[in-house]
Swiss-Prot record:
Similarity annotation: Belongs to the transposase 8 family.
Gene Ontology biological process terms in this record: DNA transposition
GO molecular function: DNA binding; transposase activity
Pfam families xrefs: HTH_Tnp_1
Name recorded for this polypeptide: Putative transposase YkgN
Top-level taxon of the source organism: Bacteria
Length: 112
């Protein structure tokens, strides 16, 4: 004879009553008409130390790490953007540099 099959939602709710609300395993098992052995097994499987919670915390740690890296890279990009503009608010491109040199040469020739 096999035991009853309970849905996942029922199991997680039973575990929440013990873990989150602080009820005793015996009282929850009696109220829900299940064995304490089953409830202990569910707590082990769905409780706060279960592998799904560890995976979620690992994923959250990865998200935090990626957010820090994104901020660092964004800050570096912003610094480089600011460095690309010289003191007279013109882009430091080779064309602008050559144009200014040519302009200075033309001005110096006209003065002489």
């Amino acid at each position: 004879m096999s035991g009853k099959r309970y849905p996942e939602e029922f199991k997680t709710e039973a575990v929440k009553q013990v873990v989150d609300l602080g009820y005793s395993v015996a009282s929850v098992a009696t109220r829900l008409d299940i064995t304490t052995h089953s409830l202990y097994a569910w707590i082990k499987k769905y409780g706060p130390d279960s592998s799904t919670n560890k995976e979620q915390s690992d994923a959250q740690a990865e998200i935090r790490r990626l957010q820090k890296e994104l901020k660092r890279v964004t800050d570096e990009r912003d610094i480089l953007k600011k460095a690309a503009v010289d003191s007279i608010c013109q882009c430091n491109t080779p064309f602008n540099y050559l144009f200014r040199c040519f302009e200075l040469q033309c001005l110096s020739r006209s003065v002489v």
